[in-house]
Amino acid sequence: MELLFVSLLSLFLLILLPLSLLFLFPSSFSTTTTEANKNSANLPPGLTGWPVVGESFQFLAAGWRGNPEKFIFDRIAKYSSYVYKTNLMLERTAVFCGAPAHKFLFSNENKLVQSWWPSSVNKIFPSSNQTSSKEEAMKMRKMLPNFFKPEALQGYIGIMDTIAQRHFAADWDNKDYIVVFPLCKRYTFWLACKIFMSIEDPKDVDRFLARFNLVAEGLLSIPIDLPGTPFHHSIKAAEFIREHLVAIIKQRKIDLAEGKASPTQDIMSYMLLTPDEDGKFMKEYDIADKILGLLVGGHDTASSACAFIVKYLAELPQVYQGVYKEQMEIAKSKGPGELLNWDDIQKMKYSWNVACEVLRLAPPLQGAFRDVLKDFMYEGFYIPKGWKVYWSAHSTHKNPEYFPEPYKFDPSRFDGSGPAPYTFVPFGGGPRMCPGKEYARLEILVFMHNLVKRFRWEKLIPDEKIVVNPMPVPEKGLPIRLFSYDA
């Protein structure tokens, strides 16, 4: 029966789905006037794959099989080019690979290209349809620096350490076996709830987390809103979270008016009290939508990084010992009950090198799409307006030209000035570089500190498969056996 189901599903995907999508999204597949008039232009080499869906399934399947870079490097080799064309996510796409391509794209943000997400994202976050993605990004980036500037970040360290201690006490201590990935998600989500919304009660955090996972799973799914599909579950989960966020926002407005809440205590208060250039304040629904988006970016990537740190430290005892030695020197310098501070974070140089090597080998952000704003030429190839460009982190992270022996775990790559510019891009680059990069660094290092001073561990599934959908995740969640230093 299972084989029959798979066969029927394959038939649907390969035949019926393309035809359905053609009727649902006809504008996505029509030939533009610009392209028709310039059909003799030198487009990049490549194939667009199956009608309508193109090579989307090959692209996604490479990740499902745990080898997302195969799609990228196979085509680089096939076309002997670091730029090639394909069809991804129902869009004609030029894939840009290598450090020079990264530099070109990041340097031309909002000039030749701008941020773009598949239509599934806009349907899950409806307020993003009211303005352009460029305008949305500019609004958010004007708000976020106040919360990610150095003095603000320094104030988060003690909060992060407190929550990390509570997290390990509740979910790790006195356990013989745990499954790592869901616990890492709980840790980073707890932090995001506290710092973005001042929510720290574990029960309130867990109420959101289960549905929040459904939101993340649907972001890059096929945008068909039918019962049972990941996209449908994602929309419903987002509606549930948004409804509860609006209730929290309404109460916050009352608390601010009565002096029970501070105007600067978190991002929620700031959004409520900060008008735009026209003197207008954001609506409650829009604030809920923005906070939902921040929660996606504020915890999913770090949770993946934390889980893979656990994975690699289990596999590499000598690396674990280096991290343990560094963190115990810091721990021994602290008084009873004294929390981590900025000076402690600055001493975690080897630990951060290890984290960076994890981010190189298993980047949470595999790459990103850009919308082409106007025709341009790159490396002699014509890229038409309206196409999408996809840049890939793997095209540099696992390229021996930039990282010799690219599959070897070597934290020393990040000693001194580190990798060459535009080769290490786990947080993107240019104006679109993740504004929460330093925030992520803090939550990862605080996690590592509290982890290694408590435990050693070993993997229960030595060769556990890694799947990418859309971020890398151990297929079984990374079950481990814990050995407590207090035991």
UniProtKB/Swiss-Prot annotation:
PROSITE patterns documented for this protein: CYTOCHROME_P450
Pfam families: p450
One of the record's GO cellular component terms: membrane
Membrane topology: Single-pass membrane protein
GO terms for biological process, alphabetical: sterol metabolic process
Swiss-Prot/TrEMBL cofactor(s): heme
Binding-site positions, heme: C434
Family indicated by similarity: Belongs to the cytochrome P450 family.
The protein's name in its UniProt record: Cytochrome P450 716A75
